[in-house]
């Protein structure tokens, strides 16, 4: 409650994270105070690992939408262009983190930009 109050005080959107394993009643409570968007975790485990099945994510998106009109973004386990394309069918947006960090570790700006463009190409 203190965190929510402080975020509201400073006009900061506290992004709510929901996993495919989060029980429905917990989802309902989590999205009640959500601002900005809902971050749906597309994998179980650490970031950058394999995503769960698309059908499971679709079901979870439907469940979340039954409680909120906020946009739903999918992240965790989004590794390449194919993942981005699949997730855009499921959710309002896609969050790519680890794959972009890996691109930056290569150090060559031209390669970085090419790799990032490859991830997001239509």
Regions found by a protein language model. Name each.
Residues 6-15, 32-38, 89-93:
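Glycine-enriched alpha-helix->loop->beta-strand junction motifs that scaffold or abut catalytic
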Residues 15-19, 49, 53, 76:
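Glycine- and other small-residue-rich loops at beta-strand/loop junctions that grip anionic moieties
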Residues 1-9, 23-29, 47-62, 81-84, ...:
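Active-site-adjacent beta->alpha loops and helix N-cap segments on the catalytic face
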Residues 22-32, 74, 78-94:
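Catalytic cores of alpha/beta
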Residues 7, 64, 87, 116-119:
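Hydrophobic positions in alpha-helices of CheY-like receiver
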Residues 40-48, 77-78, 90-109:
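Glycine-rich phosphate-binding active-site loops on the catalytic face of alpha/beta enzymes
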Residues 20-21, 114-122:
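Extended, intrinsically disordered, low-complexity segments
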Residues 7-17, 65-75:
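Short beta-strand/loop segments at the ligand-binding rim of alpha/beta enzyme cores
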């Amino acid at each position: 409650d203190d965190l929510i109050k402080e975020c509201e005080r400073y006009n900061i959107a506290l992004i709510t994270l929901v996993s495919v394993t989060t029980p429905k009643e917990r989802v309902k409570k989590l999205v009640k105070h959500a601002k900005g968007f809902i971050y749906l975790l597309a994998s179980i485990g650490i970031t950058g690992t394999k995503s769960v099945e698309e059908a499971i994510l679709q079901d979870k998106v439907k469940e979340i939408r039954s409680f909120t009109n906020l946009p739903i973004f999918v992240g965790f386990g989004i590794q390449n262009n194919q993942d981005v394309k699949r997730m855009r069918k499921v959710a309002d947006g896609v969050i790519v983190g680890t794959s972009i960090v890996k691109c930056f570790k290569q150090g060559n700006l031209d390669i970085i930009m090419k790799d990032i463009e490859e991830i997001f190409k239509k």
